[in-house]
């Protein structure tokens, strides 16, 4: 099993999502973030006690950006030939099997990954136990 190259701790500055202002009051206003552009908007004018706006200061550290908690970056894999791209980068990237891959191909990908010493982040997904078969 490959050991991650990253030794620095991954720190997320903010865990809560930035939600759209007044999305909690109206059904028609969805939660996905939109920048407020109104002339009287309290959020745009940054009043105290209102919804926070995303800005550059909330970004994570450049050295740990896009890293998973296990210390690897994610690379989505659809077949075993794509898995072989990670052979030389197995300490930086881990494979993640795409969501639309069948159980049969998943087993082949997981088996090939163990031969190449590549970590698979979702290797237990959609695998049946002996009792079900």
Swiss-Prot record:
<dbReference type="GO" id="GO:0022625">
    <property type="term" value="C:cytosolic large ribosomal subunit"/>
</dbReference>
<dbReference type="GO" id="GO:0006412">
    <property type="term" value="P:translation"/>
</dbReference>
<comment type="similarity">
    <text>Belongs to the eukaryotic ribosomal protein eL32 family.</text>
</comment>
<dbReference type="Pfam" id="PF01655">
    <property type="entry name" value="Ribosomal_L32e"/>
</dbReference>
<dbReference type="GO" id="GO:0009536">
    <property type="term" value="C:plastid"/>
</dbReference>
<dbReference type="InterPro" id="IPR001515">
    <property type="entry name" value="Ribosomal_eL32"/>
</dbReference>
<protein>
    <recommendedName>
        <fullName>Large ribosomal subunit protein eL32y</fullName>
    </recommendedName>
</protein>
<keyword id="KW-0689">Ribosomal protein</keyword>
<dbReference type="InterPro" id="IPR036351">
    <property type="entry name" value="Ribosomal_eL32_sf"/>
</dbReference>
<dbReference type="GO" id="GO:0003729">
    <property type="term" value="F:mRNA binding"/>
</dbReference>
<dbReference type="InterPro" id="IPR018263">
    <property type="entry name" value="Ribosomal_eL32_CS"/>
</dbReference>
<keyword id="KW-0687">Ribonucleoprotein</keyword>
<dbReference type="GO" id="GO:0003735">
    <property type="term" value="F:structural constituent of ribosome"/>
</dbReference>
């Amino acid at each position: 099993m490959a050991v991650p190259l990253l030794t620095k701790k991954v720190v997320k500055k903010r865990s809560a999502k930035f939600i759209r202002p007044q999305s909690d009051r109206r059904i028609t206003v969805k939660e996905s973030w939109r920048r407020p552009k109104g002339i009287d908007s309290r959020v745009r004018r940054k009043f105290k006690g209102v919804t926070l706006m995303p800005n550059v200061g909330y970004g994570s550290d450049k050295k740990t950006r896009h890293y998973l908690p296990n210390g690897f970056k994610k690379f989505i894999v659809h077949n075993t030939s794509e898995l072989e791209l990670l052979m030389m980068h197995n300490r930086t990237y881990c494979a993640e099997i795409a969501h639309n891959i069948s159980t049969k191909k998943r087993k082949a990908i997981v088996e090939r990954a163990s031969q190449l010493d590549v970590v698979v982040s979702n290797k237990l997904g959609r695998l049946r136990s002996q009792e079900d078969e």
